């Protein structure tokens, strides 16, 4: 594939390895920040986003097939399509899911919080999307299953188990270029084909000691409904699902709805946010009573 590729190495050691690989793939590389540095300075979010947008402008200007920013450890990447549009992590995962399942039928793995669109893409292509627990480690453990063709933590980490069970940005770049060459399509074309769903998220405070009560309340409320307990409680509704899941590190609950209808997603998030708030409120007087006695 004689593709033109814009690569921002973020001054990481990847710059010492990837150019040779891409030359062997007959790619023309426009390198950015390619001088490896011992210490890579962290950027605040607004500076980083501006940095990515700049990469998008360059990608479009030089008519490259793809632009990729790779983090310093070489694990995660941010992808820009040929129009210069920065793909969100969800969009990048969706596009890569389409490429992976078009090439080989199997399973794609991602956190239970991943959008409904992934199940729809997998179904269209004769594959399966299988949810995992939300942490990156859980995604990698599940990726060891022999049928897995792609796994992602939803945060720019992509794992191709036929190569290695780890998040590897170098291999991701090489594999995506290979799949684009074989399919004859573009990232922008695939992005435009991502199913339109509404994905809403809310976060509610929940003391550690009340987290179990929230889970019990959810289970009691949905005893006869179709649920998935991979992480938290996911309740399936007519046009999607709502997930109530505890944060493993903070006293919080995530309420996430993914549906075809935008209004329905908003209503589900509000309904289940209110449920978490009410359980927390009911528990507070009881906790005070225990302290007083």
Please provide the spans of the model-predicted regions.
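Phosphate-binding and adjacent anionic-ligand microenvironments
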Residues: 65-66, 104-293
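Phosphate-binding chemistry for phosphorylated carbohydrates and sugar-nucleotides
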Residues: 1-183
